[in-house]
Amino acid sequence: MVKSLMIQGTSSGAGKTILVTALCRIFSDMGYTVSPFKAQNMSNFSYIGKNFEISRAQAIQAVGARTEITPLQNPILLKPLGNYRSSVFVDGKFFKKMYASDYYENFVLKDGLKKSMNSFKKLSESHEIVFLEGAGSPAEINLQKYDITNMKMAKKTAVSYTHLTLPTKA
């Protein structure tokens, strides 16, 4: 069974991304197969791979983990366009442009959560440790109903809330 740990913070810019990057490198140095994971990221800074596009943050974390950069690590990328509209990328491919209301009401809890869980499951089958990164703050009450990146993902993946117990390496 994969071990997973989620890093959440009090706000955007709190240091979650750099902490996950560091943890990926530390545990990779210890000999574990490690992958980062962020269910949904909103950023115009992207990494363009061979036939896919994900958040640059998860690509850098994958480099830290010494693992292949893959759309599984960031199944949903939102690239803001302004006026509450974003280009939505799913599984590394452009899906469509959506207004926030359409995204929240018609996509995120239906298809978005399912896609994210499938990606996490695939990563967990090929890695010993998956570090999940939250987004912004899990305490933003105006977004909690639709927030798949923080507590919904923590509950669905049964991440460790207090500590990570690892098997010893021979």
What is the predicted function of each stretch?
Residues T165-A170:
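A short, hydrophobic C-terminal helix/tail in secreted or cell-surface proteins
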Residues V2-A14, I18-L164:
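Flexible phosphate-sensing "switch/lid" loops adjacent to ATP/NTP-binding sites
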